[in-house]
Amino acid sequence: MMINPKSIILGCLLCLCIEVLAAAHSCTTATDTLATTDYICLSPLDTAALPTLHKTKSNMRPLRNLLQGNAVWDILGRTLKRHHYSDEYIQSIQQTLEKMLRKKTLCLPCSYTSIQPNGDTLLLSGTVILPYTRELKGIVLACHYTIGSNHEAPSLCCPFESIFVTKGYAVVMADYVGFGISANLTHPYLYWQSAANATVDLLQAVPNLLAHYGYTYPNQIISYGYSEGAPVALGVAQVIEQTLPDWTLTALYAGAGPYNVAMTYDYCVQHDSVGIPCAIPMLIMGTSAGYHLNLQKEDFFQDPLLTHYEEWVESKRYTVNEIANILQSHRLSEVMTDTGRDKTQSETARFYNALQQSDILGYVPHCQTYLFHSTEDDMVPFVNSEQLQNSITTNNSTITFDFAPYGTHMAACIRFLKQVYQTID
């Protein structure tokens, strides 16, 4: 295959810009939150708060052509690996992307009401990213991966998934409960029903916004998610196909997800290891919040995590990488109590029973579906995707399983995003 020299040059310039931003990152301050009034209310739509949009055109072609080729992805993949997928480098990529899209798109942090699985009505937040051209190809519902700090929430940064706007789609992303405007709440981690409701409720609030600006669009949805976002993307697809006849789900892309949460917990306990050190603690307290179990940290955590959980995790000040650096251990036996790792204990049994309600095995999508997982994943056990495949194996030719040794969880994420971007028309 011929490599376009211009793509290599542009890719090198892009990475140089990222390097400069990464070097300067320690001198910049991330936005941890917005005031409630900074979010544009979508339900009901606050038209007075909406910015005036005069532009009707934006030249996305250079960036689209760059991302449609392989050179920039190869450069980014190698450079990310060299920087050990550091928070600073990832944020510098987001800052570079934001600069490239700033004058070509309308990015709106927004608030809306969502009805959660337990019936609670919450004020949540997310982001809607629009190209200036008023003719959309559809809407990409992008479900974000595991985050720890509030400044990583989609409404407070420029998420990687915003690149789909260069293909002519609106990109819609929910922050999930516990981030953005609801950062004071505990995030119900890996409770896909909560995140799927948050995402679909945001989708339902978008048509009035698009009508206000005069956008035309088919009622077609692409559901996308990686890592924590993968089971959410499947859940979103299920909700749309089963309960929203006015919307058509055209494609589903899910990568490296913890589809069977109870099994994932068992796997981590059995191996006394977890790829993201704070993941199981977040899962315990998130499940407690989502299912109103009122679990006590003393039954599950050892010091120093027990003493500092509120500061390190619940404050949403630190990324998962920063929390990992604080904990200095990937062994569950060093952060959790014996009781918390024993399903025969009453409180752990209550937690585990709730986990068994949080898997999404068995749902068979009816749209074009691409399921991806690296067999070498170091964060989300590959057995999750094996179980998902076994649970939905049919003669349905619309489902593609792409399971191969694509490297670590983070390395495979770049490959997945590239594959999806280059596949979407």
Language-model segment annotations:
Residues 5-6, 14, 20-105:
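N-terminal targeting or regulatory segments adjacent to alpha/beta-hydrolase or S9 domains
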Residues 90-133, 138:
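N-terminal cap/lid segment of alpha/beta-hydrolase-fold proteins
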Residues 134-137, 145-172, 177-183:
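Short substrate-entry loop that stabilizes the transition state in hydrolases
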Residues 189-211:
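Alpha/beta-hydrolase active-site loop
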Residues 204-275:
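Primarily recognizes the serine-hydrolase "nucleophile elbow" in alpha/beta-hydrolase
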Residues 255-362:
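Accessory cap/linker subdomain of secreted extracellular hydrolases
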Residues 266, 347-354, 379, 383-425:
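C-terminal catalytic histidine-bearing segment of alpha/beta-hydrolase fold enzymes
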Residues 370-377:
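Short beta-strand/loop motif that positions the catalytic acidic residue
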